[in-house]
Structure formats: C-alpha cells, structure tokens
C-alpha cells in the first residue's frame, strides 16, 4: 500500500457525474494506492503512520506536529496510478495495482481506520473508481510517501 501525503492549505474533490463535492482546509490531501497482495495489516500500518506523521509546524516553525495536534482535515482519494510502472516503453502499466474489488474494500477500511484515529468530522473522501477533479493547494510544499512494504 502506498500513500502520497501532501500538506495543504486547501483541497477539494468534485465528481461531476455524481453531483459530488467535498472540500477541506489546513490539512492533508492523501492519495492512496492499493497493491495486489495488500491486506488489512497494510491498512493499519499506513493509516496509523499517516495520522501520526509530524509534518505540521510548531511554534518554532519546526515540523513537529501531527494532523491530530493541529486539528487538521484530511481528504482521501483512491489512486491506482500510484503503482504505475513506466520502466519499459512510454505507456505505464498497472499490473501491480490491486484488482478493483480488493482495492475498494481496503480503501473503505483505510477511511474507517483514519476516522477512528482522527475523528470522522475531519475526514472527507472521494468515491472509489470515479473520475474525479482534485484541487490541491500545497503548503510548503510538503509531500511524503508512506509505504507498507519496501
């Protein structure tokens, strides 16, 4: 499992065909990729790591606070292309990405785990498998990759 974590001033997701829109401010936009073979243990590891990453500045302007410490918001977006491989040719392959059934289940479990960790009122999410318009206004920028397996 792979999470691309971005500290943001604001973020949003719009799904025009679903008439769906969510927005956050001062927090994290997290793009989540699920790999073939991932399990609930991967969900727990990555979710806990992302909820406790100290990527927000303290009073000394040092990255020393977590999203929980700053009462930040998180926008979670499923992104199978995080496992895109472009080593051969010019068109990426996605054979490492989990099949939709597994990925959807683990994506929903990830959201559930983050809500338990941070509080559901601060968590927003995209819709698995939907074509989305994602708005990200980075803060820093600060971008961290969290993986459950090397």
Where are the model-predicted features located?
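S-adenosyl-L-methionine-dependent methyltransferase catalytic core, i.e., the SAM/SAH-binding region
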Residues: 97
């Amino acid at each position: 499992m792979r999470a691309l974590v971005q500290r943001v001033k604001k973020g949003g997701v719009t799904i025009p065909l679903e008439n769906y829109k969510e927005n956050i401010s001062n927090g994290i936009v997290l793009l989540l990729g699920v790999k073939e073979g991932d399990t609930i243990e991967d969900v727990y590891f990555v979710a806990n790591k992302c909820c406790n990453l100290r990527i927000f500045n303290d009073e000394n302007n040092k990255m020393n606070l977590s999203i929980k410490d700053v009462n930040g918001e998180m926008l979670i977006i499923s992104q199978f292309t995080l496992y895109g491989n472009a080593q051969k040719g010019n068109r990426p392959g996605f054979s490492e990405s989990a099949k939709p059934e597994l990925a959807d289940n683990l994506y929903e479990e990830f959201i559930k785990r983050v809500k338990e960790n941070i509080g559901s009122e601060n968590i927003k999410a995209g819709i698995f498998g939907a074509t989305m318009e994602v708005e990200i206004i980075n803060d820093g920028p600060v971008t961290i990759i969290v993986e459950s397996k090397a």
